[in-house]
Swiss-Prot record:
<dbReference type="Pfam" id="PF00533">
    <property type="entry name" value="BRCT"/>
</dbReference>
<dbReference type="InterPro" id="IPR010994">
    <property type="entry name" value="RuvA_2-like"/>
</dbReference>
<feature type="binding site">
    <location>
        <position position="113"/>
    </location>
    <ligand>
        <name>NAD(+)</name>
    </ligand>
</feature>
<dbReference type="InterPro" id="IPR004150">
    <property type="entry name" value="NAD_DNA_ligase_OB"/>
</dbReference>
<dbReference type="Pfam" id="PF22745">
    <property type="entry name" value="Nlig-Ia"/>
</dbReference>
<feature type="binding site">
    <location>
        <position position="173"/>
    </location>
    <ligand>
        <name>NAD(+)</name>
    </ligand>
</feature>
<dbReference type="GO" id="GO:0005829">
    <property type="term" value="C:cytosol"/>
</dbReference>
<dbReference type="InterPro" id="IPR001679">
    <property type="entry name" value="DNA_ligase"/>
</dbReference>
<comment type="similarity">
    <text>Belongs to the NAD-dependent DNA ligase family. LigA subfamily.</text>
</comment>
<feature type="binding site">
    <location>
        <position position="290"/>
    </location>
    <ligand>
        <name>NAD(+)</name>
    </ligand>
</feature>
<feature type="binding site">
    <location>
        <begin position="81"/>
        <end position="82"/>
    </location>
    <ligand>
        <name>NAD(+)</name>
    </ligand>
</feature>
<dbReference type="InterPro" id="IPR018239">
    <property type="entry name" value="DNA_ligase_AS"/>
</dbReference>
<keyword id="KW-0227">DNA damage</keyword>
<dbReference type="Pfam" id="PF12826">
    <property type="entry name" value="HHH_2"/>
</dbReference>
<protein>
    <recommendedName>
        <fullName>DNA ligase</fullName>
        <ecNumber>6.5.1.2</ecNumber>
    </recommendedName>
</protein>
<dbReference type="Pfam" id="PF14520">
    <property type="entry name" value="HHH_5"/>
</dbReference>
<dbReference type="GO" id="GO:0006260">
    <property type="term" value="P:DNA replication"/>
</dbReference>
Amino acid sequence: MESIEQQLIELRTTLRHHEYLYHVMDAPEIPDAEYDRLMRELRELETKHPELITPDSPTQRVGAAPLAAFSQIRHEVPMLSLDNVFDEESFLAFNKRVQDRLKSNEKVTWCCELKLDGLAVSILYENGVLVSAATRGDGTTGEDITSNVRTIRAIPLKLHGENIPARLEVRGEVFLPQAGFEKINEDARRTGGKVFANPRNAAAGSLRQLDPRITAKRPLTFFCYGVGVLEGGELPDTHLGRLMQFKAWGLPVSDRVTLCESAEEVLAFYHEVEKDRPTLGFDIDGVVIKVNSLAQQEQLGFVARAPRWAVAFKFPAQEQMTFVRDVEFQVGRTGAITPVARLEPVHVAGVLVSNATLHNADEIERLGLRIGDKVVIRRAGDVIPQVVNVVLSERPEDTREVVFPTHCPVCGSDVERVEGEAVARCTGGLICGAQRKESLKHFVSRRAMDVDGMGDKIIDQLVEKEYVHTPADLFKLTAVKLTGLERMGPKSAQNVVNALEKAKETTFARFLYALGIREVGEATAAGLAAYFGTLEALEAASIEELQKVPDVGIVVASHVHNFFAEESNRNVISELLAEGVHWPEPIVINAEEIDSPFAGKTVVLTGSLSQMSRDDAKARLVELGAKVAGSVSKKTDLVIAGEAAGSKLAKAQELGIEVIDETEMLRLLGS
């Protein structure tokens, strides 16, 4: 059996290794939850054997040594970490320790904040002017990132207002909103650059660039949460008061900071934030709970690496470790070959996960993934679980290479990867059963032709029995033929036939979207329909003419042009029209002639609406001369935010785009 000393040495060595990967290399190998577990194990052993605690134990310090590439800044006041709790019982025990240690009947109130998942920084202002900025580093010495911090627009270079201290060190978190993270990775995949595993890594990598011009291109932002050095001035005597003073001086503070009068209110805040977490637009991994009174904070003091007056109440882990048992390849409706990791099932954020996307061959190469590897799985909100990284230090000896197919796993056709694209595709087209199934499922979906009752299992059977080859074949189905399918009685079969008949009456935009042209989503389909008005005009359009449609670039224009240039596609369209698919004659809208607050504006809808469906809202906006887009960009004029608006709202706020709610939208629609 291992001695206690040997266990402590191994735990400290392991933790130091992972601290170095996390804080210095920005390349964590294990989930935060696993690091926390190892730290708890070490702390418990040291508590039982205090005589074995060493000054350099990870429990006695914060972080790791700074990179040599940056000059160093010594923190005048150490930047400490926080202790963690993971359940209500542990928080209530912390609450009791605070009450007992104060030894008075004085009421304790709590200032609660979001625990942002970014990079802790210290920013020094002298006479209100930003003079330096540093990372946390090892808590005593950090890296000088002044030039990079100056590029972050959320951080003021000069404070404004009155009574600004002569020297004020503000502490906070630099982080990357989800929309910005997705854009960085999207660009990286397109250009062959570095793809980041999560927003925290992307924020750290962006902030620690040796070239500030690169940092300036990254949409980093910042919230402050504390103070270090304070000279030649005064601050309020409560933590919340200080944050509000920071805000008055122009420093960004989260609008979710909340004062709680009791432990029960703290728990209610925790659960409210946990519920809202998927729609915040940026990553958090818990809430931070601080004694609000500065006098009480001073009474409580510090332990070696953390204050006694604050704690991080962490959410259930969104990352876990498991093993890759196999890698299979799925074929989508456009022929895209997507590798999927088959995992040893593991619970992540309350959900049992057994599969995770690997995106493409480049991602497998970037990860260095082999079948049999131990990997970190991440699941955030409704995002499909993905492999974040491989735990190389625990790679088994019997792992196998992942071999990307050269032929379609479904139909055997050649797999082709166009130069400059990350995705490999099956060249089989509609002879490929997988593409045929997915194309038909898309065609009948609610936002396309909206064929009620035509579910995935029915489509699967229709393709497997060779009843249907193209979308036009759907409209030739009879109740008798449908009755031969599993779980399909005469009544259900007739209902499907009736739904197909009803679906023949559609709109030009829906019809275009249903065709499944590559990279033509609802918004693009609506734009094409509004611009060209008729199918004949669209079919005849050149690539140059197609690019005149708002938000249609060379890539989408080429996909549309190539689709209509293909004779088999034109034949399917002719068959659909012959089967009776039709839509109203176009109403040509000239935005300049419409007297409407939306005329000529590019509008984005986000979140859920309570008074009308999103489709109805889109249709009404288009009638009033708006161009409804699917994503927020610098070209967006207005964002309409419903309930639970997420990353699109965050991006709009980041870009300074006008935002209105559903009530204001309805008022303007009525005007």
